[in-house]
Curated annotation (Swiss-Prot):
Its main location: cytoplasm. This is Dual-specificity RNA methyltransferase RlmN. PANTHER family: 23S RRNA METHYLTRANSFERASE, RADICAL SAM CORE DOMAIN-CONTAINING PROTEIN. Specifically methylates position 2 of adenine 2503 in 23S rRNA and position 2 of adenine 37 in tRNAs. m2A2503 modification seems to play a crucial role in the proofreading step occurring at the peptidyl transferase center and thus would serve to optimize ribosomal fidelity. Its cofactor is [4Fe-4S] cluster. It is found in: Cytoplasm. Residues 106-333 form the Radical SAM core domain. GO terms for biological process: rRNA base methylation; tRNA methylation. HAMAP family: RNA_methyltr_RlmN. Binds 1 [4Fe-4S] cluster. The cluster is coordinated with 3 cysteines and an exchangeable S-adenosyl-L-methionine. The active site is at 99 (proton acceptor), 338 (s-methylcysteine intermediate). It comes from Syntrophotalea carbinolica (strain DSM 2380 / NBRC 103641 / GraBd1) (Pelobacter carbinolicus).
Length: 371
């Protein structure tokens, strides 16, 4: 695909919080309340054409056309799993690609896993995304637009920042994207419905807790520094003792726990000794452990644990009073499971643009219906 076309240099309003959009419009000499109107068109009705904003004057619409634009993401391709999981491939304006995953849940609910970077710098050896390195950060608009695109396929009840990239390596843009997700004039999600996963960037974890409310998940995957250093290079900079201290200091709201993701890898971190060390490591932390059997992929020589080993590991944690859940790995047949995203699909093109536009929901009739 030729991506050499001139870039649109107008300001993308999808990168603005309500406060920033208010100031932008005030700088144009417009009333401050207009920002809320524009926001609601962009996010409640998923409109990206100023001419469709019927409660704005023709003069304002014309001025906005000249100075601003509203970006969108349309899937270049989609791939559907036998279990109902859908993977989206998005091509960004500079030609780079990212993936998002829509995961079906019980009661016709859905969780959306979104990306925060093109590639990833963390280099976790079990993760396919990390094998490509970091290309660039996503903008707030590129993060939020993944949700807007998925809403065209139906409600999204929960959002997890667990796709391509390390969210805390793109902290400023991620915080702004979360603010847009939470705003009543934006996508109006409750922070209770949004979870951010980190490999363990300790200073950014501390900053995150001060700046925005979000459920925290920590990709742990080992109980000793020796093993975690090998699996996750970030541990050489922020070893387990520092990571656990940051977790104990993270501001938790009532009834909330920090989720610790533990990818169980055969003969690497799945022993009885690992289970015992994990109980000790998380002592005193309001914790929930998600046990994730390793999802095998071509870029790794690691193997999945046996069913017997998974049950034994989980059983030990449960017997010692921990909340330990085996997480089902959905979308494995389309490489959409944990650690398998790579920003490339080889599938037939999606439905025609007109069909997708006609399926777009009008979210103006009441707010928060996707929660």
């Amino acid at each position: 695909m030729d991506v050499s076309m001139d870039q649109d240099t107008r300001i993308d309003l999808k990168n603005f919080t309500l406060e920033e959009l208010t100031e932008f419009l005030a700088g144009m000499g417009k009333e401050r309340f207009r920002a809320g109107q524009v926001m609601r068109w962009m996010y409640h009705r998923l409109v990206d054409d100023f001419d469709a904003m019927s409660d704005l004057s023709k003069v304002l619409r014309a001025e906005l056309h000249q100075r601003a634009r509203i970006s969108r993401l349309t899937p270049e391709a989609t791939e559907d799993s036998r279990d109902g999981t859908r993977k989206y491939l998005f091509r960004l304006e500079d030609g780079e690609t990212i993936e998002s995953v829509r995961i079906p849940m019980d009661d016709n609910r859905a969780t959306l896993c979104i990306s925060t970077q093109v590639g990833c710098a963390m280099g976790c050896v079990f993760c396919h995304t990390g094998s490509f390195g970091l290309v660039r950060n996503l903008t707030p608009g590129e993060i939020v637009n993944q949700v807007c695109a998925a809403l065209a396929d139906g409600p999204v009840n929960n959002i997890v920042l667990m796709g391509m990239g390390e969210p805390l390596h793109n902290l400023d843009n991620v915080v702004k994207a979360l603010q847009i997700l939470y705003m009543p004039q934006g996508l109006d999600y409750s922070p209770r419905k949004v979870t951010l996963s980190t490999a363990g960037l300790v200073p950014q974890m501390q900053e995150l807790g001060k700046r925005v409310r979000v459920n925290l998940a920590v990709s742990l995957n080992a109980t000793t520094d020796e093993v975690r250093n090998r699996l996750m290079p970030v541990n050489q900079r922020y070893p387990l003792q520092q990571l656990m201290a940051a977790c104990r200091q993270y501001p938790l709201h009532a009834k909330k726990r920090i989720t610790f993701e533990y990818i169980l890898i055969r003969d690497v971190n799945d022993s009885d000794q690992d289970a015992r060390r994990l109980v000790k490591l998380l002592h005193g932390i309001k914790a929930k452990v998600n046990i994730i059997p390793f999802n095998e992929h071509s870029a790794s020589e690691f193997r999945a644990p046996t069913e017997e080993r998974i049950s034994r590991f989980q059983g030990y944690l449960l017997d010692h009073g921990m909340v330990a859940i085996r997480r089902a790995s959905k979308g494995q047949d389309i490489s959409a499971a944990c650690g398998q995203l790579k920003g490339k699909l080889t599938v037939s093109p999606p439905a025609q643009e007109s069909e997708r536009n006609s399926a777009r929901p009008d979210r103006s009739q009441g707010k928060g219906k996707h929660l």
